Design a protein with these regions (language model features):
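Short S/T/G/P-rich N-terminal loop/turn motif that feeds into the first structured element of a domain
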Residues: 1-21, 76-105, 112-115
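Catalytic NTP-binding/metal-coordinating core of nucleotidyl cyclase/transferase enzymes
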Residues: 95-164
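Alpha-helical scaffold within the catalytic cores of cyclic-nucleotide enzymes
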Residues: 127-144, 156-192, 203-216
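Basic, amphipathic alpha-helical hairpins
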Residues: 256-269, 289, 293, 310-319, ...
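Terminal helix-turn-helix DNA-binding modules in bacterial transcription factors
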Residues: 291-330, 353-360
Length: 360
C-alpha cells in the first residue's frame, strides 16, 4: 500500500470498529509500516469473507491477503495482540498506532549431538541440547528478543532491531563450548508477517530452516536483507564465525530445497530431473552446490534424504523400512548402510534412543 501513513490507517481502523458487529467481527489491533507501505490487521472473524465485507463496507480498502493465525503466535512474534499502551492520542481522540510488524527472525538448529561410541556403548546426551538451548534463550531475552518456539534441538526467536538480533546471535556463538559434540547452526533473516505463505512469517521461517539445512563451516549465517539492517561498523568487519549470503544465492537455495522437499520421497527423482526443474546444466548445479553447500548434487540429495529420514525416526514410530521408502531409498538395507555411515548408528537404534531420551 504505497503512501500509507499511520493517521489514515487509524481512521480506517476506527471505521472498521464502528461496523465490526454488523459482520460478527472484532477488530483487535493493527501494525503500520510507513517505510515499506505495509499494514497488518488482527481481526477475530468467522470467515475470510466477513473480513473482506467489513473492510469493503467500512472504507473500501480490500485486504491483499488473509491468513488464519493463532493469538499466541502473534503475541510471540509481534509482542502484542491489543493496541499498544503508548499509542498516540490526537486532540479529537483518534488513537494512532505507529508500530511496524517487520521483524528479524532467528532460527537455531542443533544437528546431531553427542551420539558417540564409548566402550561399545552409545551415549545419547540430551543434557547437551538443554544446555545450549538454555543459554541461547537467555541471550535472546537479554537482547530484547522474544522466544517464539523452542524444542529440544530447534528454536525460533523474534527481534524488532537487526543489531539486537545479531548481538544475541554472536553471544550464543561466543558461548559455544568447542568440546561439545554439537553442530549449532544459527540463521538470521528479516521479513513481514504475511507474504506468499499461509503461515505467519511463513516465508521468512521457511528460508531460515532451509539455510540451516546447509552444511557450513560457520555457525552464524545472515541474509543480505539482515545485513542491510546492521550499522556499518558491524557488517564492515564481520568475524570469521559469520557468513553472509547474497540475494541470488537465497533464491537458489529456496528453489533447490523447495524441489528437494517436494520430490525427495520419489525414488525416481534424480539430479537430472532436478537440473531440469532449476533450468540449470549439471555442471552449473555442481558449481553452485559445492560452493554454497559443500556437497556435490548427488551427495546433497542423499544427505537430504538421510536428514529427513532422521527427522521421521526421531518424531514417529514408523518402521525403518517404511521410512526408507518414504524418503526415496529403493532398498531398506542400502538405507541402513547409508544411515550407519552418516550418523554412526543403525536407524532402529537411533529411533529407540531418540524416543527413550537415554542418557547413559
Amino acid at each position: 500500500m504505497p503512501g500509507v501513513n499511520a493517521k489514515d490507517v487509524a481512521q480506517a481502523h476506527n471505521m472498521d470498529v464502528l461496523m465490526e458487529h454488523e459482520h460478527s467481527c472484532k477488530c483487535l489491533t493493527y501494525w503500520v509500516d510507513e517505510m515499506r507501505g505495509y499494514v497488518f490487521c488482527l481481526i477475530d472473524a468467522p470467515s475470510k469473507e466477513s473480513v473482506i465485507n467489513l473492510h469493503s463496507k467500512a472504507h473500501g480498502l480490500v485486504p491483499h491477503k488473509i491468513i488464519e493465525v493463532e493469538h499466541t503466535l502473534v503475541q510471540a512474534f509481534l509482542g502484542r495482540i491489543t493496541d499498544p499502551e503508548n499509542a498516540l492520542l490526537t486532540e479529537n481522540g483518534l488513537k494512532i498506532v505507529d508500530d511496524t510488524s517487520f521483524r528479524i527472525i532467528m532460527h537455531i538448529q542443533i544437528e546431531e549431538l553427542s551420539l558417540r561410541e564409548r566402550n561399545q556403548k552409545i551415549e545419547f546426551d540430551s543434557k547437551a541440547y538443554q544446555s545450549i538451548m538454555t543459554d541461547a534463550k537467555a541471550h535472546v531475552v537479554r537482547h530484547n528478543g522474544r522466544i517464539v518456539s523452542g524444542e529440544a534441538n530447534e528454536m525460533l526467536a523474534s527481534f524488532v532491531l537487526g543489531e539486537q538480533a545479531f548481538q544475541a546471535s554472536m553471544a550464543i556463538v561466543d558461548g559455544l563450548d568447542d568440546t561439545k559434540s554439537a553442530d549449532v547452526r544459527i540463521s538470521l533473516h528479516a521479513g513481514l508477517p504475511v507474504t506468499q505463505s499461509d503461515k505467519l512469517f511463513g516465508d521468512t521461517v521457511q528460508l531460515l530452516k532451509r539455510l540451516n539445512r546447509m552444511s557450513r563451516d560457520t555457525p552464524l549465517l545472515i541474509t543480505a536483507g539482515l545485513k542491510e539492517l546492521l550499522p556499518e561498523p558491524l557488517w564492515a568487519s564481520l568475524p570469521s564465525t559469520v557468513r553472509s549470503i547474497a540475494p541470488g544465492d537465497e533464491t537458489f537455495i529456496n528453489d533447490l530445497f523447495g524441489i528437494l522437499e517436494s520430490h525427495h520421497h520419489d525414488e525416481h527423482f534424480d539430479i537430472e530431473k532436478c537440473c531440469r526443474m532449476l533450468a540449470l546444466s549439471q555442471s552449473q548445479l555442481y558449481r553452485k552446490t559445492t560452493q554454497l553447500l559443500q556437497f556435490s548434487p548427488n551427495n546433497l540429495l542423499k544427505n537430504y534424504r538421510l536428514s529427513r529420514a532422521k527427522d521421521y525416526l526421531r518424531t514417529t514410530n514408523k518402521p525403518v523400512s517404511q521410512i526408507s521408502f518414504e524418503t526415496g531409498f529403493t532398498s531398506a538395507s542400502y538405507f541402513t548402510k547409508c544411515f550407519k555411515a552418516a550418523f554412526g548408528l543403525l536407524p532402529l537404534h537411533y529411533q529407540e534412543l531418540s524416543h527413550n531420551g537415554l542418557n547413559q
